[in-house]
Design a protein with these regions (language model features):
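A short helix->loop->beta-strand "cap" motif at the edges of active sites that frequently abuts
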Residues: 110-115, 279
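Conserved catalytic-core segment of nucleotide-activated headgroup transferases in glycan assembly
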Residues: 41, 191-299
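Short N-terminal targeting/anchoring amphipathic segment
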Residues: 18-23, 82-98
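A donor-sugar binding/catalytic signature common to diverse glycosyltransferases
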Residues: 90-102, 316-338
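Active-site-proximal region of nucleotide-activated glycan assembly enzymes
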Residues: 114-216
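Nucleotide-activated donor-binding/catalytic signature segment of Leloir-type glycosyltransferases, i.e.
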Residues: 296-316
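N-terminal subdomain of nucleotide-sugar transferases
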Residues: 1-51
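N-terminal beta-loop-helix "entrance" segment that forms/cooperates
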Residues: 53-70
């Protein structure tokens, strides 16, 4: 049987396009570094900036950088003309559900330009995902498990190489995010028509990020202790339910539930009714959501409505805090509010 070696999507992008347009990237200088890499590989890289935060991490003085400060309604025609004029063959963005990126995907497809989207890594840590045509629920990846079982024997066996660790974690990401929003709100007149994909109020973010930092510091020691208990198997058999950021596109666009809260309560209800008596459930609150949403009130209300459960608030390492619920007859619910 002839075996196949899969190319990664970054290599596919590199080989399929000479003129590449970058839209908004993740907070930080990732797209600037990507542009440098593409340029070093002989590509002509164009970039659209939509706000002053974009300008800070990708200076408009970079070659082929365009300041788009027209109205949102003018964007489709502007993009169409730009693609035609500069012979753009690939459009690249981070997140395929931002307002401008939704339009960009349609315009790219109409003009025979490929559309590529980066996303937080499907595999973590140390990875970022890149897919053609869309990510998450828009991903072209097959949904059938048997597809992968059928394809695996056809793939050439390769030696696993662990990814190079990336320095940092939460702190550098938070610094980049704070800097981005400071720039965005400090100079709104340059981009008076910009539409952000999340709340666009500086005070809103400052207050809630401050709460997140305080919670992180407050829970630090207890997080380490809980992590050791989990690793030592103190909680026995358990299911784990990771929660998404409350306003993430996965929730707003792709989720079958109207909110993370409704999903959480559904899971707790199902677990309380159907779980084996010797199992626990750990619900992980997203680390970026700690200052924005506190699900502990919902969980306490749930426990009150189900007197067979009682709860004790604890915390968890890695991400936020953890809530542990114990049933007298031995059903345990470990929920994390990271």
């Amino acid at each position: 049987m002839k075996q196949t070696v899969l190319q990664n999507n970054l290599q596919n992008l590199l080989e399929s396009a000479e003129n590449i347009l970058l839209l908004q990237g993740p907070v930080g200088n990732f797209f600037l570094r990507l542009a440098d890499w593409l340029t070093a590989n002989g590509k002509t890289v164009h970039k659209f900036n939509f706000n002053a935060g974009d300008d800070y991490f990708y200076p408009p003085t970079q070659a082929h950088t365009v300041v788009f400060n027209d109205s949102y309604d003018a964007f489709p025609e502007f993009l169409q003309e730009y693609i035609a004029q500069h012979h753009i063959q690939a459009v690249v963005c981070f997140g395929d559900t931002r307002p401008y990126h939704i339009i960009a995907k349609r315009i790219a497809n109409e003009n025979q330009a490929s559309f590529w989207a980066f996303e937080e890594g499907y595999f973590r840590p140390y990875y970022i995902t890149l897919e053609k045509d869309g990510v998450n629920a828009f991903s072209p990846l097959p949904r059938r498990a048997d597809f992968f079982l059928e394809q695996f024997p056809k793939l050439a066996q390769q030696e696993y190489k662990a990814p190079t660790p990336v320095r940092g974690g939460f702190t550098p990401m938070a610094k980049n995010a704070i800097r981005y929003y400071i720039e965005l709100f400090r100079n709104p007149n340059k981009y008076p028509n910009y539409i952000h994909h999340r709340a666009s109020n500086a005070g809103h973010y400052l207050k809630l990020w401050s709460i997140s930092i305080l919670k992180r510091l407050n829970y630090y020691i207890e997080d380490i202790q809980i992590a050791k208990r989990v690793e030592a198997g103190k909680y026995g058999k358990f299911f784990i339910v990771p929660l998404q950021v409350f306003n993430d596109s996965q929730v707003r666009i792709h989720c079958d539930f109207p909110s993370v809260r409704s999903f959480l309560l559904h899971v707790l209800s199902s677990f309380a009714e159907h779980a084996p008596a010797d199992t626990n459930i750990i619900i992980k609150h997203h680390p970026m959501d700690r200052g924005f949403i506190d699900y502990w009130r919902d969980i306490k209300r749930f426990i009150k409505e189900h007197p067979e459960l009682k709860g004790l608030l604890v915390k968890k390492k890695f991400r936020p805090s953890e809530k542990h619920f114990r049933r007298p007859e031995a059903i345990n619910i470990l929920a994390t509010a990271m």
